[in-house]
Amino acid sequence: MKKRYFAGAAVAAMILTAGMATTSFADWSQQNGKWYYYNDNNGRLVRNDWVCSKDAWYYMDYNGVMQTNSLIDDTYYVNENGVMITNTWKYINNSRWNESGWRYFGANGKAYTNGWKQINDVWYHFTDSVLDIGWVEIDGKIYHLEDSGAMTTGWRKLADREDDWGEYWYYFNSSGKLIYDGELKISGETYIFDHSGRMLT
């Protein structure tokens, strides 16, 4: 992400949060309901670049229009006021690429990408920036992720991961890995699990 800081835009955020009622102020300019930003150093319209105004980041497209409610470069997201979001979850409907789902944008505004990420002491897994849920196989190990995306641990009664017929008891260790094809002593009791991880009675 290429970011530039324009000191002349220090008051622009006040305009945006006030409903953008003013048509022009400092280096921001509203034209036909769209916002543009002119570089205070040379007066040129900013295109395909980021603008920082009072510690908030805004993205201007190839026409110089400030973007709102948009995913930028499949990495950042700007809200209804055009501000890049940070440290928050956002559900993005990206049906064009079949990648709709929850994403988490970190302190630098970037969406978490592939792999395990810990957020507020909870483990989540992402594939192509989208939060995974349900049964997943990662590096040859089987895990289950709750509807919230949180990694499952301990005992859990779930639909069969292979044929989806009925519900069975499964056990996931402290690392979230499914126990299967063997036996394990849990709280003093020995349990046997089949090849798919179902507890056998």
Give the label of every model feature segment.
Residues 2-201:
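Extracellular adhesion/carbohydrate-binding repeat motifs centered on closely spaced tryptophans
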